[in-house]
Swiss-Prot record:
It catalyses: a ubiquinone + NADH + 5 H(+)(in) = a ubiquinol + NAD(+) + 4 H(+)(out). Its EC number is 7.1.1.2. It comes from Rhipicephalus sanguineus (Brown dog tick). The keyword Protease does not apply. InterPro entries: NADH_UbQ_OxRdtase_su1/FPO, NADH_UbQ_OxRdtase_su1_CS. Keywords: Electron transport, Membrane, Mitochondrion, Mitochondrion inner membrane, NAD, Respiratory chain, Translocase, Transmembrane, Transmembrane helix, Transport, Ubiquinone. This is NADH-ubiquinone oxidoreductase chain 1. The gene is ND1.
Length: 313
């Protein structure tokens, strides 16, 4: 038990270290998207920029306004990073004695709870801008959570298991992305909306003057929100690899491609209007997810009947 805790602690430590250099990679890529160089002054080729950013954020003073609900405002970012760390338990315990047979259900439960932290952080700031941003983010996450659950259930029909390891076993020779390319495209759209990334960053509005639900945050609390968001991006990249690209020898290559794709989307696409975002969630993504759920079930049923009729008798 103690050894498991030590291994998990090392995993979280490596994730937090990876987040630092992932932000550096994003800033470099965005710089080249804008035909300029990214951070290149701190250390050799800017490699020490994440360390300098961390020192700057954690050394700043946290401004506490008298109208804030201080306890909830402090606890909300801590809930965000705690949910992010709990999601990484899926990948650690998958290759361990504490294997989660219901890892898909565990992921859906944790991702649903994480949306409450956005609502609490916006409400506790007692600012109308942060409150509107938290309302938008909460409604967006709820809308796309349903489609995400439908996609995961439709994929879980194929290996007949809610364990992510079972997806790797059925993809040893042939990845599911070739058979389920439409579901993969819908999954990427849904994931970007869940992560509040461009072009669906309505909760935050990274390129605007008012930065959404986290406008009143600074110092170490802002750094914690920042780390939880980028930790979720890395976790979703691993999850997408498990679901669609399960070739064991190329795990780091595919995960890096997915992370780079999310960065390039931020540097390429513009933000959608909020009404278009909601209309796409309920009128386009959700009906298609339900159709794919029924198609997966009937395809699996017909394959089983074919095998039983031709080979079992």
């Amino acid at each position: 038990m103690i050894l498991n805790f030590i291994y998990y602690f090392i995993l979280i430590l490596m994730v937090l270290l990876s987040i630092a250099f992932f932000t550096l990679m994003e800033r470099k890529f965005l710089g080249y998207c804008h035909i300029r160089k990214g951070p290149n002054k701190t250390g050799a080729m800017g490699l020490l920029q994440p360390i300098s950013d961390a020192l700057k954020l954690f050394s700043k003073e946290m401004n506490k306004m008298f109208y804030m609900n201080k306890f909830i405002q402090i606890i909300s970012p801590l809930i965000m990073i705690l949910m992010m760390m709990m999601m990484w338990m899926i990948f650690y315990f998958s290759n361990n004695a504490l294997n989660l047979n219901m890892s898909i259900i565990f992921f859906l439960c944790i991702s649903s709870l994480a949306s409450y932290a956005i609502l609490f952080s916006g409400w506790s700031s007692n600012s109308k801008y942060s409150l509107i941003g938290s309302y938008r983010g909460f409604a967006q996450v709820i809308s796309y959570e349903v489609s995400m659950a439908m996609i995961l259930i439709s994929l879980a029909i194929i290996p007949q298991s809610y364990n992510f390891i079972s997806f790797l076993k059925i993809q040893e020779t042939f990845p599911l992305i070739f058979s389920f390319l439409p579901i993969f495209i819908i999954w990427i759209i849904t994931v970007l909306a869940e992560l509040n990334r461009v072009p669906f960053d309505l909760a935050e509005g990274e390129s605007e003057l008012v930065s959404g639900f986290n406008i009143e945050y600074g110092s170490w609390l802002f750094a914690i929100i920042f780390m939880s968001e980028y930790g979720d991006i890395m976790m979703i990249s691993f999850l997408t690899y498990y679901l669609f690209l399960g070739l064991k020898n190329l795990i780091l290559f595919f995960v890096l491609i997915l992370m780079t794709m999310i960065i390039m989307i931020r540097g390429t696409y513009v933000r959608m209007r909020y009404d278009q975002l909601m209309m796409m969630a309920w009128k386009m993504i959700l009906p298609q997810s339900i159709i794919f759920l029924f198609l997966s079930y009937f395809i699996f049923l017909n394959i089983n009947n074919f095998i039983c009729i031709n080979f079992c008798n």
